[in-house]
């Protein structure tokens, strides 16, 4: 069901096309760091076609306007022959202009579609690398605890205590779900509330209770669409699902809603298609929500336990700020997420992700990895939070801007981070 997002039908430029024109080599070099082939030449060819189509359309519009004025002048001068010739020209222009406008629209959509599939470009200080092996350790908190026994896996403990039930969850919903009961159900709720209270009371975040179902254009705004459509869960009205055939696919897509994979999606989109006053920035938002992921690319990975579930609970942090403040805001967000683990006295490390391991929308990412003694042979670090600065990448997709003292609208910068994943902390 892949297709063009509704948000892409206008000319929304996800990357600064002027920057690509000015320095195509730098754009291709940034893509290479992401493990991608050069694209500047093909993008600029589409851009040139688009600009030529716009020029033709504008010239035709201008000529129609001037010819219409000349008709009046010719009639005043009683030059009937010239007036007739000009009227014929205007009629022809009226016929050709829809074709020219259609060519502009087609070129707009072609460029937007190509740009929509290109990830954000890494900042200069992001480490080189193609996968997790290129990530760089930034710092460590705490130490590995020594046990007089062999630690068990969390799911073995949970099942033995009667507080985790994967078998019944599978009957209800299939694989990668769990039923939490008794003390673990209460503990999960308490941990989530602790995280939320910490971020709102001590870190200055505003609590939000957002919708869990969102439109395609909202998913597009934060970068889940179009590339990761298969990783999402979708809710569709029963009447549409019952009548699915090839002719109904378009309507199915236009009316479906996506279950949020993270509260980043609705929180960041709170500023979509708007211009906020610079005095309102930074906006710091947080939410405790269920999250839903199809995990289409995770077949065979972490099939046991609560590490990789289709449904999980997470506290999300989102910041909307100005370009000049986003670097410091990234460090602040990381510190807020770390404070959760410090207060829980959990051993963790912070990793700076390399260019090839970052998420689609990120310019730079810090992962917080918590030590899990029951994982692997003798324990292992596993991600519990990911804090990313996205620059204006998401803002361009959402058309989210701020107005400074000079009155000129500029794109905001967006940041997001887990504060943290409740199930993994549990």
Regions picked out by a protein language model, each given a short descriptive name:
Residues 10-145, 163, 167:
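N-terminal alpha-helical targeting/anchoring segments
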Residues 6-8:
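A cross-taxon signal for low-complexity, glycine/charged-rich
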Residues 139-426:
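TRNA-recognition modules of translation machinery and tRNA-sensing kinases, especially anticodon-binding
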């Amino acid at each position: 069901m892949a297709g063009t997002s509704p948000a892409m039908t206008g000319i929304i430029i996800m990357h600064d096309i002027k920057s690509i024109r000015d320095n195509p080599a730098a754009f291709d070099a940034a893509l290479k760091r992401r493990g991608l082939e050069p694209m500047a030449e093909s993008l600029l060819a589409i851009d040139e076609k688009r600009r030529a189509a716009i020029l033709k359309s504008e010239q035709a519009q201008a000529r129609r306007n001037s010819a219409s004025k000349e008709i009046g002048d010719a009639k005043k001068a009683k030059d009937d022959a010239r007036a007739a010739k000009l009227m014929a020209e205007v009629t022809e222009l009226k016929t050709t202009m829809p074709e020219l406008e259609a060519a502009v629209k087609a070129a707009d959509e072609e460029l937007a579609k190509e740009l929509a599939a290109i990830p954000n470009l890494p900042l200069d200080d992001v480490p080189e690398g193609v996968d997790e092996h290129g990530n760089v350790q930034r710092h460590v908190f705490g130490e590995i605890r020594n046990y007089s026994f062999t630690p068990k896996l969390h799911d073995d403990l949970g099942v033995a205590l009667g507080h985790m039930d994967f078998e019944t969850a599978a009957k209800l919903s299939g694989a990668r779900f769990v039923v939490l009961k008794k003390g673990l159900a209460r503990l999960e709720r308490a941990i989530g509330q602790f995280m939320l209270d910490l971020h709102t009371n001590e870190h200055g975040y505003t609590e939000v209770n957002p919708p869990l179902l969102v439109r395609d254009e909202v998913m597009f705004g934060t970068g889940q669409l179009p590339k990761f459509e298969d990783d999402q869960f979708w809710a569709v009205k029963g009447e549409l699902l019952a009548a699915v055939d090839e002719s109904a696919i378009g309507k199915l897509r236009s009316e479906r809603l996506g279950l949020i994979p993270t509260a980043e999606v609705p929180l960041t989109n709170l500023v979509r298609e708007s211009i906020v006053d610079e005095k309102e920035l930074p906006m710091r938002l947080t939410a405790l929500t269920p999250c839903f992921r199809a995990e289409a690319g995770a077949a065979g990975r972490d099939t046991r336990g609560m590490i990789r579930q289709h449904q999980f609970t997470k506290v999300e942090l989102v910041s909307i700020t100005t370009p000049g403040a986003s670097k410091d805001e990234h460090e602040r967000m990381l510190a807020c997420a770390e404070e959760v683990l410090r207060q829980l006295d959990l051993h963790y490390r912070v990793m700076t992700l390399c260019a090839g391991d970052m998420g689609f929308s990120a310019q730079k990412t810090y992962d917080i990895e918590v030590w899990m003694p029951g994982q692997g042979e003798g324990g292992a670090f596993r991600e519990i939070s990911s804090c990313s600065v996205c620059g204006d990448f998401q803002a361009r997709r959402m058309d989210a801007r701020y107005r400074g003292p000079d009155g000129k609208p500029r794109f905001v910068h967006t940041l997001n981070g887990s504060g943290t994943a409740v199930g993994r902390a549990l």
